[in-house]
Amino acid sequence: MTFMTEVDPVVTEGSLLADETSKEEQLKAAAERINNAELTEGELDESMAPEHYEASDLRVLEGLEAVRIRPGMYIGSTGPRGLHHLVYEIVDNSVDEALAGYASHIEVTILPDNGIRVVDDGRGIPVDEVPGEGVSGVETVMTKLHAGGKFGGGGYAVSGGLHGVGISVVNALSTRVDIEVRRQGFHWTQTYIDQHPTAPLKQGEPMTEGESTGTSVTFWADPKIFETTIYDFETLRSRFQQMAFLNKGLKISLTDERENDQAGDEVAGDAADEPGAKHQTVTYQYLNGIKDYVDYLVKVRKATPVEEDVISFEAEDLKLGISAELAMQWTTAYSEAVHTFANTISTTEGGTHEEGFRAALTSLVNRYARDKGILKDKDENLSGDDVREGLTAVISVKLTNPQFEGQTKTKLGNSEAKTFVQRVMTDKLGDWFDAHPAEAKNIIQKAIEASRARLAAKKARENTRRKSIFESAGMPDKLKDCQSSNPEECELFIVEGDSAGGSAIQGRNPITQAILPLRGKILNTERASLDRMMKSDTIESLITAVGGGYGEDFDISKVRYHKGIIMADADVDGAHIATLNLTLFFRYMRPMITAGYVYVAMPPLYRLKWTKGPHDFVYTDAERDRVLAEGKANGRQLPKGEGIQRYKGLGEMSYQELWETTMDPEHRILKQVHIEDAAAADETFSMLMGDEVEPRRLFIQRNAKNVRWIDA
């Protein structure tokens, strides 16, 4: 799923950070920046280093204290993403039990007071005393970081957790945790208040005949840590549906016991369609695993399959400690949707398993096409982009010792994964082609059509470039470039309309800020072929300005700006234009998003012109009302008649206003776009850019209240 994260400070006009700020306040501010991943510990050491540094200055953070001081290091953030991550930590433990073959059903409940309960039918956390610890296994995993079965020799062969911190981190960031274990014939219970057990683990009632073993964890997130403690049903639902797809046969249930406060829930079969109604339980179980997943994704894309059935196969190598499941189906769509996972973790940056898949697929299709005479000697080989056009695929590998790397630790690095997946693809898909020659021919014919479109688009681009002899360095006419050639400090503002573009050009910092005005709405790349897309002057201008190319040939090292900022009006039309731009980046320049180079500017809706003191820019009607009430409560006043200025569009702002509100790094708000779950993001883009109005309406209605962190 794609999220936008606030990265630039919210500063009122004229405000300054005084030099006299106390050391204590500086430390507090620095700690908050660490939690929000804006400052590393090393930078903190450099910026706040005392003049004297002795042993007495050293501080060792014991146990869960470190988690509470820097929660962002353990769960990513203290915003909604981090809050939901707490639930995933507990559920991941239950999934580990399922992967080990001991659990078959996980039940998650959102309680009326926004507590969370997770119940599984696994083996139950060990209740015996842990040697050397002097306390039970339950208390050990609740209070010690990196304590659990995944750190020993024989607890789990495969584990889904990246960090393995799990339940102890949930305890660290909760006001209360209730735990119940069904094991060794009894119910065992323990309660934790503010991270500490209220009593030792208690042996309770005997288990009844036929009652399964397992673990129940109920927790309440700490409102002093998190910006919000209100869970989003759809976020959890989407995640658990994906978990069910990736763990064949595992049943996952989600129940929301809160009263629903608004109409319009997009979940089919979920009864929360009227205010006051309670969410019903949704349950997911897929006996065909990722084969069902691909079938589901194809239906979401509303694309027509090229072959009738989803192609799927699986393999295992006990010696290497790796297994793989692969499922795929070609469709009439123009973009590919290949999603990869390692130990059920979404590897949004790809990795060695995806490299093996791509290499084998391209090689196999070309070899088969030549062997069957479909490709002639004079024909050039089909590219990877050609072969994968319209392909929906899921690759899921499970490894004993996964190695994650990349920008966000979501890129698989195990070399054995590449060779294994490549071998499996070559053997299994080769056999499928031999057994289904008619379907194989259709797949290859589609790739040949994609190749022709690609070559036609390339020729059109070359013709355009030959005509554009007056363009400097081949850059688009409309681009007003910046003076700096250092990509790390350069920003490209992609601006809706010539009027706003003119204001942006006047108001910008010409040293580091480039402006590219785009006239009207760009082509919907979700539903356009490559040659049609590349015939669009608007899209060609954007791709040329960015500098990295597109598709399989995209080269992140050639990108000319490390901030690509989409700047559109703060209304529905502006949101649509921003989404069209994001679709282009997601489908054809995705490494830009993965690298953290894509942003959305947040122009204000209102300016409150106080008679005394700095003016305030606000971004929603609700924020206007709140800031207005707070200001009046503090004795502030607005001039009559013109105290509240509403901005109807970027083009209505003067260049000074555009600079002050939307472009000045000291005052602006930017949302950084990043992909947490590529498959969910793919589903969202397909829905937003598709033909059906109703799912889009429901999505917007449900997310209207969450515009500050809405899925892009």
Please report, for each region that a protein language model flagged, where it lies by residue.
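Residues immediately C-terminal
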Residues: D96-E97, G124-I125, V572-D573
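Conserved short strand/loop->alpha-helix "switch" segment adjacent to the catalytic nucleotide/phosphoryl-transfer site
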Residues: I69-V87
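C-terminal interaction appendages of subunits in large macromolecular complexes
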Residues: F3-E6, R452-E471, N486-E491, G502, ...
